[in-house]
């Protein structure tokens, strides 16, 4: 294979000639240090290469080595609990090799350890017919994850050979498939190009909610398994803490956290917290179901794009095994800024605010890889990839290109409001600007499995919050005393919704995670208060008298979110009894 020659270097962009037979998105090794790069444009025999490592010290006329392959990652046992860089190089292996806290340029480390032996249990036998995606055996990778070994997509035929149960490395052939006369070995590990979505049989409608334990996300703006969500917000509004809560407490089987161009100390927080935290669904350490991709702001700009694709490809691989996976990306704005930087260096025509004109199509390609699917292969199974991405608009301007284009492709919008954050209301999600297109799809699940009145209670809360915002404008002008009694009640109910339900402390042991049943019990208390109080107000009892009659009951309801554990929900029965007793006494007074 002919080697190219460097003609020009412009930061992470390298131009090489003598590359006539090169292909788009082919991986090349640049210069004497053999830095990893990817061809992003070809003009004649010149190739424009985005280099995923620091190019300082490279000179014109140095060689460019072609590999003939696209940027691919290794998929197999050994991914869970690992921390990778943006090119799927394991950081712990690099540290052992270099004895340094920094990643050396041009370093080559296998993504999956070649020496570790995994206990493989076959699920098929010689002579069975298999196709791409068929499960041929399992490896118990962690106590939480049963790693299902799949036939690579596009391989099909009859099994000529299957190994017996035992311990094997990821490079040992565990089966041989006779594919039209060719013998194709199947190993525990397979490779897949990151820019190509993995195939599936059929895309399905997402109907089951992805429970996160965060009340405003689960109830007001729910996301379904296989859904897409964006969390835009200015600096300091709580994007990272919200995403970390998602990664920690969500009901996904596998969580992939991609730190794309964010500060290194945020990834350090993750690495410090995850080993000590327990998964609320299983009681096991969270790291047993998590993969971290660390591509921090001080790493090369071009690798941000690779890290996003590496993350979504790993998510698709676990989806193909029949698991619900969650990809958390923080943040896609940094990826878009990398595209802008490279586009400028390649002298492309800029579009709005200097971003390249193909920004919308890149974002669309990324979000379209989410979804709930019927997978290829046997036995029949269903999996999902849910994508939640932070967007960091400068100054909190939601009209800037990355936020406005992202809004076109996501079905859930969780906008963070800096004024709420400054008022210490966390999560600072603005309940007036946010939306979810999955409410109708997931309402049936909530009504069936949690509370038959869930949809009714949720809609009452949303209506109250919208009406309260309208009334606040009037209160600013003429004061609260001029309001009708029913409007005063709306202000009181809205205060209860915000304090008892929407506010949630991510650092409180009890309040950090609310089970669906606990969320429904808090909603029920608010719903009962609003229903009974509305009837009394209609009978002429002032809102102030109703609130005064409650005494310490309303503060007790507000405190219950951090006082009552998820397994002590019978304590809500007592609160309900107290609430109903107060209203019965008020009704007796009104009747006399």
Curated annotation (Swiss-Prot):
One MF annotation (Gene Ontology) recorded for this entry: ATP binding
Which CDD domains does this chain map to? ATP-synt_V_A-type_alpha_C (cd18111), ATP-synt_V_A-type_alpha_N (cd18119), V_A-ATPase_A (cd01134)
Task: Return the similarity comment.
Answer: Belongs to the ATPase alpha/beta chains family.
What is said about its interaction partners and assembly? Has multiple subunits with at least A(3), B(3), C, D, E, F, H, I and proteolipid K(x).
EC numbers for this chain: 7.1.2.2
Q: Could you identify this protein by its name?
A: A-type ATP synthase subunit A
Which keywords appear in this protein's UniProt record, sorted alphabetically? ATP synthesis, ATP-binding, Cell membrane, Hydrogen ion transport, Ion transport, Membrane, Nucleotide-binding, Translocase, Transport
Membrane topology term: Peripheral membrane protein
The cross-references to SUPFAM superfamilies, in alphabetical order and at most eight, read:
C-terminal domain of alpha and beta subunits of F1 ATP synthase (SSF47917), N-terminal domain of alpha and beta subunits of F1 ATP synthase (SSF50615), P-loop containing nucleoside triphosphate hydrolases (SSF52540)
Q: Which GO terms describe its cellular component?
A: plasma membrane; proton-transporting two-sector ATPase complex, catalytic domain
Biological role: Component of the A-type ATP synthase that produces ATP from ADP in the presence of a proton gradient across the membrane. The A chain is the catalytic subunit.
What the entry lists under SMART domains is as follows: AAA (SM00382)
Q: Which Gene3D superfamilies match?
A: 2.40.30.20, 2.40.50.100, Bovine Mitochondrial F1-atpase, Atp Synthase Beta Chain, Chain D, domain 3 (1.10.1140.10), P-loop containing nucleotide triphosphate hydrolases (3.40.50.300)
- List the gene name: atpA
State its location(s).
Cell membrane
Which superkingdom? Archaea
| Coiled-coil residue spans | none
